[in-house]
Amino acid sequence: MIILCLTIFANIFKPGWTGANERTFLAVKPDGVQRRLVGEIIRRFERKGFKLVGMKLLQASEAQLRQHYWELREKPFYNGLVKYMSSGPIVAMVWQGLDVVKTARKMLGETNPADSLPGTIRGDYCVEVGRNVIHGSDSVESAAREISLWFEDHELFCYEECGQHWIYA
């Protein structure tokens, strides 16, 4: 009985979604991969103090992309977005840290690179909204959905970083 209760609580209160354990999903899009920006993007998130807990290079299927961008299905650019995102490999990543969803969105910049400030990823590396280098979850709820779409539980790692005490009080 105790094991059953612990299993239920473990599934209800999953680690990784609040406080310093909050997680977000990022995907370097085909243009970012082709332009060799993956390392620069990882560098920025590591230097900010976030922890990489999952990453893979993959060719996304059209079905997976349609599910990922389901909320945009009525938009005129939807089919083009799916076609573009399946045109080459992407790098899917899960990052963890305090307020990582909100902070990652600020680090990415606006969806339209023309509206992005210098110092943001899109402000520094993009010129066109259709080729804006990177996707990032827009909420904790979206992050949970997107992470479960792109990663299985065994592909995400929990580990203690030796420098974590220098980042979090």
Curated annotation (Swiss-Prot):
Family from the record: Belongs to the NDK family.
Cellular localisation: Mitochondrion outer membrane; Cytoplasm; Cytoplasm, Cytoskeleton, Cilium basal body
GO MF annotation: an example: nucleoside diphosphate kinase activity
Keyword Mitochondrion attached: yes
Active-site residues, Swiss-Prot/TrEMBL: 135 (pros-phosphohistidine intermediate)
GO biological process, any: GTP biosynthetic process
Domain notes: The N-terminal hydrophobic region (1-17) is critical for mitochondrial outer membrane targeting and phosphatidic acid binding.
Membrane topology, as annotated: Peripheral membrane protein
Catalytic activity: a 2'-deoxyribonucleoside 5'-diphosphate + ATP = a 2'-deoxyribonucleoside 5'-triphosphate + ADP; a ribonucleoside 5'-diphosphate + ATP = a ribonucleoside 5'-triphosphate + ADP
UniProt protein name: Nucleoside diphosphate kinase 3
Major subcellular site: mitochondrion
Keyword Mitochondrion: yes
Oligomer and partners: Homohexamer.
Disruption phenotype: Morpholino knockdown of the protein results in cyst formation and left-right asymmetry defects.
InterPro entries from the UniProt entry: NDK-like_dom, NDK-like_dom_sf, Nucleoside_diP_kinase, Nucleoside_diP_kinase_AS
One GO location term (cellular component): mitochondrial outer membrane
Alphabetized SUPFAM superfamilies for the sequence: Nucleoside diphosphate kinase, NDK (SSF54919)
Membrane-spanning parts: none
Protein EC: 2.7.4.6
General function of this protein: Catalyzes the phosphorylation of ribonucleosides and deoxyribonucleoside diphosphates, other than ATP, into the corresponding triphosphates with ATP as the major phosphate donor. The ATP gamma phosphate is transferred to the nucleoside diphosphate beta phosphate via a ping-pong mechanism, using a phosphorylated active-site intermediate. Through the catalyzed exchange of gamma-phosphate between di- and triphosphonucleosides participates in regulation of intracellular nucleotide homeostasis. Required for ciliary function during renal development.
Pfam hit, one: NDK
Keywords: ATP-binding, Cell projection, Cytoplasm, Cytoskeleton, Kinase, Membrane, Mitochondrion, Mitochondrion outer membrane, Nucleotide-binding, Transferase
Origin: domain of life: Eukaryota
Residues holding ADP: 29, 105, 111, 122, 129, 132
